[in-house]
Structures are given as structure tokens and as C-alpha cells.
Regions:
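Short acidic linear motifs
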Residues: 1-156
Length: 156
């Protein structure tokens, strides 16, 4: 009878690679291009909206120990310190979409050049439960939201 089990040799552990936000964005786009048409990039997301970087290791040159987060609705990608932004984008985007289905006007603060979303109007009409901690803006591109206040100069 053996008291001790023989240890299995462990696979050599690879060192984590450091990647930039731009590298992750390029890797996600390349992943989506390489996949079959019916497989969207949101399949890379975990329940907490972090990106499963192990599935991007062939595009990144290894597995990163960093965390990046993506909005399910706008596909914007963020670093860990901005992990609250994708959730806000998704909640408010759903509220804006529902609002636009029932109203002809835009839920933006009147007079703002960058079309800042009017949270009070969305809350008052029961499309949003609470105000996000950051301002969001309604773009002209399919009425998608962004967190960038200067989005108007980037679309042209």
C-alpha cells in the first residue's frame, strides 16, 4: 500500500504578458473576424463583464493577468480602474432604447452640444431606476451611448 501519491509533473507555467488597452481592442476585433458569423464578441465576456483574456492568448502572445471590461451593448472596452463604466453604459443604453421606442424626443439635456443624457427625465418616466455616477452622451451613430464628452469630434 502506498502512502504517498506520485506527483504529476506540472506544466511549465507561462509568465503573464502585459497588454495595453489598444492591444486588447485589436485582439477582440481579430477574434470576432476569425470566428463564424453567428458568434459575437460578447461570447468573450464573463458574468461580471470582464473579458476572458485566456481566449485571446493567440492574439495577445500569451495570457495576461490584467482585467479588462466590455459593454455588452456598445462593445466599448475599459481597463480595470474604469470597470463601472460598462455596466452604466448597458443600463442607460437599455433605458434610452426603451424611451425612444415610446417617445419622439431625445432624452438629452436641452442645450448641451454633446447631447448629455437627461437621467432625471429617464427616472421620472420610469425607464431608469437610479442615476449613474458618470455622465453619458447620446451619439448620432444609431443613438449609441458613450462616456466620452468630446465624441462629436471623433465621429467625422
Amino acid at each position: 500500500m502506498r502512502w504517498f501519491k506520485r506527483r504529476k509533473p506540472s506544466a511549465p507555467r507561462q509568465e503573464a504578458v502585459h497588454v495595453t488597452l489598444d492591444e486588447v481592442k485589436r485582439a477582440v476585433l481579430q477574434y470576432e473576424q476569425d470566428m463564424q458569423e453567428q458568434i459575437p464578441r460578447t461570447t468573450l465576456l464573463r458574468p461580471d463583464q470582464s473579458i476572458d483574456l485566456s481566449r485571446l492568448k493567440r492574439y495577445l502572445g500569451g495570457i495576461s493577468d490584467q482585467r479588462f471590461y466590455m459593454s455588452r451593448m456598445t462593445y466599448e472596452i475599459f481597463e480595470e480602474q474604469d470597470m463601472h463604466i460598462p455596466l452604466s453604459l448597458d443600463v442607460v443604453q437599455a433605458a434610452v432604447d426603451d424611451y425612444l421606442d415610446h417617445h419622439d424626443d431625445l432624452p438629452v439635456i436641452p442645450g448641451t452640444r454633446n447631447r448629455q443624457v437627461h437621467y432625471d427625465k429617464l427616472i421620472e418616466r420610469h425607464y431608469l431606476k437610479e442615476k449613474p455616477s458618470i455622465p453619458l452622451y447620446l451619439t448620432t451613430e444609431q443613438f449609441m451611448l458613450t462616456h466620452e464628452p468630446d465624441w462629436t469630434g471623433r465621429l467625422h
